[in-house]
């Protein structure tokens, strides 16, 4: 997968993308990440990318010309991805990102992230994007942090990125539910013991316990997810029995 970040702060990505899973994905040729600084496409000698808003108001608004030139430059240089790419604008007006969206985006060959800053975008910039995405109902200084988060979540869905091929399907939210409790050595710590079912080697019982615990954890902390999760009749009966 190719990822293009259109940003005026490409240096912000060095830390998060320079370590851990994302770096390994890049090193293994699974991810190919590029940066385009839209300040380089500013038309005046001072390379201004923002201006005061028409009608007055606080803050500065990103100008359309540099962004249009930058995004069009990226798209022109990567025409081989044109049939299977998505242009995303990081904006709090967009729907909140979730695991289902991560799985969807993992199916594209190229993702182009438009990262804003300052007060916001000139409204005409939104026409460059296929969709807007947010991390939730709060404001961040710029679009770089959401772009990093989304890249991390999407990259975990790509074959070969995680150490174990079954890691992603057992992650929290992968099946629409929160993850079951996890345990490791020692078997007992300060009077707290690992559930016996995890120690007996019966994989069918372990799978059942994990599913039931996932249902209980979701019910306790995010009951809203149960309305959208794919629940079997057995799941529904278990939840009803544990009201």
Q: Locations of the language-model features?
A:
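Charged phosphate-binding loop/patch that engages nucleotide di/tri-phosphates or the phosphate backbone
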Residues: 224-243
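N-terminal nucleotide/polyanion-binding subdomain common to many enzyme families
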Residues: 1-77, 199, 204-227
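Phosphate/anion-contacting hairpin/loop surfaces
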Residues: 116
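Short, glycine/charged-enriched secondary-structure capping and boundary segments
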Residues: 19-21, 102-105, 127-129, 147-149
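Hydrophobic/aromatic beta-strand patches that form the interior of the parallel beta-sheet core
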Residues: 4-6, 34-36, 88, 111-112, ...
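S-adenosyl-L-methionine/SAH cofactor-binding core of RNA-modifying enzymes
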Residues: 63-113, 122, 159
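Structured adenosyl-cofactor binding patch, chiefly the S-adenosyl-L-methionine
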Residues: 121, 125-171
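Internal, active-site/partner-interface "lid" segment
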Residues: 145, 157-200
């Amino acid at each position: 997968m190719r990822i293009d970040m259109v940003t005026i702060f490409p240096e912000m990505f060095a830390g998060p993308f320079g370590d851990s899973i994302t770096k390994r994905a890049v090193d293994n040729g699974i991810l190919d990440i590029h940066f385009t600084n839209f300040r380089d496409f500013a038309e005046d000698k001072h390379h201004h990318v923002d201006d005061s808003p028409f009608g007055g108001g606080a803050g500065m608004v990103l100008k359309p010309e540099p962004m249009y030139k930058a995004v069009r430059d990226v798209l022109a240089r990567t025409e081989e991805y044109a049939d299977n790419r998505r242009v995303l604008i990081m904006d709090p007006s967009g729907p909140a990102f979730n695991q289902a969206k991560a799985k969807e985006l993992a199916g594209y060959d190229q993702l182009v992230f438009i990262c804003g800053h300052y007060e916001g975008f000139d409204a005409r910039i939104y026409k460059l994007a296929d969709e807007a995405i947010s991390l939730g109902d709060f404001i961040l200084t710029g679009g770089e942090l959401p772009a990093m988060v989304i890249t991390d979540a999407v990259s975990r869905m790509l074959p070969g990125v995680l150490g174990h091929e079954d890691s992603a399907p057992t992650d929290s939210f992968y099946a629409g539910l929160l993850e079951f409790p996890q345990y490791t050595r020692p078997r007992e710590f300060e009077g707290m013991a690992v559930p016996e079912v995890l120690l007996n080697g019966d994989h069918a019982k372990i799978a059942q316990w994990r599913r039931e615990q996932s249902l209980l954890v979701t019910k306790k902390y995010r009951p809203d997810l149960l309305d959208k999760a794919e629940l079997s009749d057995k799941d529904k009966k278990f939840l009803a029995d544990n009201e």
